Amino acid sequence: MPLLWLRGFLLASCWIIVRSSPTPGSGGHSAAPDCPSCALATLPKDVPNSQPEMVEAVKKHILNMLHLKKRPDVTQPVPKAALLNAIRKLHVGKVGENGYVELEDDIGRRAEMNELMEQTSEIITFAEAGTARKTLRFEISKEGSDLSVVERAEIWLFLKVPKANRTRTKVSIRLFQQQRRPQGSADAGEEAEDVGFPEEKSEVLISEKVVDARKSTWHIFPVSSSIQRLLDQGKSALDIRTACEQCHETGASLVLLGKKKKKEEEAEGRKRDGEGAGVDEEKEQSHRPFLMLQARQSEEHPHRRRRRGLECDGKVNICCKKQFFVSFKDIGWNDWIIAPSGYHANYCEGECPSHIAGTSGSSLSFHSTVINHYRMRGHSPFANLKSCCVPTKLRPMSMLYYDDGQNIIKKDIQNMIVEECGCS
């Protein structure tokens, strides 16, 4: 069954490549290719006067992506004032002093944000009961062991308020982080006794918030800087103490119970002073405090760094990305394409030795590695296959242009520009 699946995948891949590449004898003019990189790679770049053929391939690709059979016929230029008004209403960019339109690269920024979000992990850690009254401990999951940059960190606490409260509308809630004090510190003992901690611990205020005490609800306390310091120190546990001095005036209480049983808390002599005593245990567990952490790896992190494709520099013959820019002014298309000023028609070229096949960080890698495994061992039907240099990462492109009716159109085209190349 796995072999049949691989054969089907391979045949489908070959069909796509053949379909998107021009026939060798046709000069690349048979149809607008779906993959400009494939078409450009097959053109004879070393042959004199081959540049026009590459430009023609790019032209056909752009028209194909815009669903146009031919370039629009713009008989009269649109007045600059009308163009400015249209761009302002479309919120797509601005016109520079030189008359060129600069597009706001929203789609590019979205792509960058999506890539960044893919690298970001979200971890939710529920609180455990601390070693002293009104204390909690948050153990950051081992899943976050390779995360070093905190994007956001918040502690969520539930404040329970009795229905009869009419005495105070606002209360102040403070969070203190417990920190170990170096042994032998002169003022450790007195301060620690005041807050009920062992002598080697002290505390620092990390978050404070004035909240509405007229209804029971969740409250969020930002603690990003504290978690960042914790990770920088190589630690994974956050110990905090909560304080709500005005809560007793309203009868309000913070639900703080972790895994300790209610009877154990009562055995310690806890009273209704902001600790959630006297509430049904099951409901308390549903209101259990938690830490929400969003973090990512540092760009300088040496491990699991995303492999980047090679840039062709004339010194390597291994699969790489070849830069190729087509100016719309140079090809006479700036009369109907308002922005951008040109197209980065990058393409992939180079050899794919067996030892680097399937090494890119793309979705092709898994299939390529499996097929390469069978191919190197001489298994049919993969024995005579050769790996291909293909795009592994593409980014979108925004275009602003006139149609035949001189209407201004903005279109975001996905997978338009080759960013990285790899071996299939």
Curated annotation (Swiss-Prot):
SUPFAM superfamilies for this protein: Cystine-knot cytokines
Disulfide bonds: 312-320, 319-389, 348-421, 352-423
Compositionally biased spans, kind Acidic residues: 188-197
Coiled coil regions in record: none
Gene3D superfamilies in the record: 2.60.120.970, Cystine-knot cytokines
Start-end of Basic and acidic residues biased regions: 263-275
Name under which the protein is recorded: Inhibin beta A chain
Residues spanning the signal sequence: 1-20
Keyword set includes Ubl conjugation: no
Organism listed in the record: Sus scrofa (Pig)
A molecular-function term among this protein's GO annotations: cytokine activity
Residues cleaved off as propeptide: 21-308
Domain of life: Eukaryota
PANTHER family: INHIBIN BETA A CHAIN (PTHR11848:SF133), TGF-BETA FAMILY (PTHR11848)
GO CC annotation: activin A complex; enzyme activator complex; extracellular region; extracellular space; inhibin A complex; perinuclear region of cytoplasm
Region named Disordered: 178-197, 259-306
PROSITE patterns with a match to the protein in the record: TGF_BETA_1, TGF_BETA_2
Record's keyword terms, sorted: Cleavage on pair of basic residues, Disulfide bond, Glycoprotein, Growth factor, Hormone, Secreted, Signal
Gene name of the record: INHBA
General function of this protein: Inhibins/activins are involved in regulating a number of diverse functions such as hypothalamic and pituitary hormone secretion, gonadal hormone secretion, germ cell development and maturation, erythroid differentiation, insulin secretion, nerve cell survival, embryonic axial development or bone growth, depending on their subunit composition. Activin A is a homodimer of INHBA that plays a role in several essential biological processes including embryonic development, stem cell maintenance and differentiation, haematopoiesis, cell proliferation and tissue fibrosis. Signals through type I (such as ACVR1B or ACVR1C) and type II receptors (such as ACVR2A, ACVR2B or BMPR2) which, upon ligand binding, phosphorylate SMAD2 and SMAD3 intracellular signaling mediators that form a complex with SMAD4, translocate to the nucleus and modulate gene expression.
Compartments in which it is found: Secreted
Assembly: Dimeric, linked by one or more disulfide bonds. Inhibin A is a dimer of alpha/INHA and beta-A/INHBA. Activin A is a homodimer of beta-A/INHBA. Activin AB is a dimer of beta-A/INHBA and beta-B/INHBB. Interacts with FST and FSTL3; these interactions prevent activin A interaction to its type II receptor. Activin A interacts with ACVR2A. Activin A interacts with BMPR2. Inhibin A interacts with ACVR1; this interaction creates a non-signaling complex (NSC) that inhibits ACVR1-mediated BMP signaling. Inhibin A interacts with ACVR2A.
Gene Ontology biological process terms from the UniProt entry: activin receptor signaling pathway; androgen metabolic process; androst-4-ene-3,17-dione biosynthetic process; endodermal cell differentiation; extrinsic apoptotic signaling pathway; eyelid development in camera-type eye; hair follicle development; hematopoietic progenitor cell differentiation
Family statement: Belongs to the TGF-beta family.
Glycosites: 165
InterPro entries per record: Cystine-knot_cytokine, Inhibin_betaA, TGF-b_C, TGF-b_propeptide, TGF-beta-rel, TGFb_CS
